[in-house]
Amino acid sequence: MAGSTFGTLFRITTWGESHGPALGVVVDGCPAGIPLTTDYIQAFLDRRKPGQSKFTTARRESDTVEILSGVFEGYTTGTPISLVVRNNDQRSHDYNNIKDCYRPGHADYTFDKKYGLRDYRGGGRTSGRETIGRVAGGAVASRILECLGIKLTTYTKAIGPVSIPSDAYDYSVINENRLYMPNSEYAQQAAAYLEQCISDQDSSGGLIECIIEGMPAGVGEPVFDKLDASLAKAVMSIGAVKGVEIGDGFSVTSSKGSINNDSFISENGQVLKQTNHSGGILGGISDGSSIILRAAIKPTPSISQPQKTVNTAGENIEIAISGRHDPVIVPRAVVVVESMAAITLTDLLMQNMTSRIEYLKNIYL
């Protein structure tokens, strides 16, 4: 199976299946001397693990991380970092009645067409549990970014029709509700909406927003590895993501150049922008202002309502999916989006060291 490695200089390779013995990641290209502990990585994994509220799957997994290599006495050694998380609460029998069915909204049919066989137990590699490796690798990248003064703030902007206006954000309450929304009142409204979805045996999608602060100007690799293109690819590779926008995104289609252009000013010897419609990126290169990224998350495809589909014999059938499934995946996907953004930024920062001879001289002379 190709496509399980992401990155150029800072790379992650994820492995494992939803109902296999374990999942994990190998992180390559991490510099030596970065402080890193299991507790630090665990804090990231805890943000995505299941069973933390009525709005997540009831599957009970501690998602406890083990560091197998690449860290010694609390610091990275510069060698590959191997991280593993054991599966403990698989219930594969939940899938026996649908193992020969193509579940609507899932990758069952396409995997059959590509490989000629598939792991029907929870979707195998297509399961949301695949993101464990992304988050563990993202924790390593985030630790590097912290050392460089770069901060990522990621949260749920919308669940279903409940969307928080930008002028109503309160970042201090993001971790005070299980939906990771930056407004307590809107979090309550979203919870009520999700209660109705559960009652209707249905699910919801939503919108995740990531704000990146402290990113220096000049990072990004034109033409095909632009910063925004790289971020979009990274985030779009997450199974539940159906769209990515940077800055004003799709709303620019109804704007004008006189409005959309961000005017520059010089202040205390610094070049600044008066607005940030571009979302911190111009020409595929960071401009020094905050990078603003949003990811559209589709409704969880596993629902208990009867749905029409086809089985592997080509017969028209109707199924209702039982088992333990999230009515909304958005809150658990927040840290996944953040992790993929962190991995992308770390990789491009390392690539940027080759853009000027002065950078190499600073290292070697």
What is each of the regions a protein language model found here?
Residues 15, 21, 201-204, 208-316:
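Glycine-rich anion/phosphate-binding loop at the beta-strand->alpha-helix junction
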Residues 21-33, 128-150, 225, 229-233, ...:
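Alpha-helical support elements that line or immediately flank enzyme active sites
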Residues 11-14, 119-130, 217-221, 276-281, ...:
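A short glycine/serine-rich beta->alpha loop
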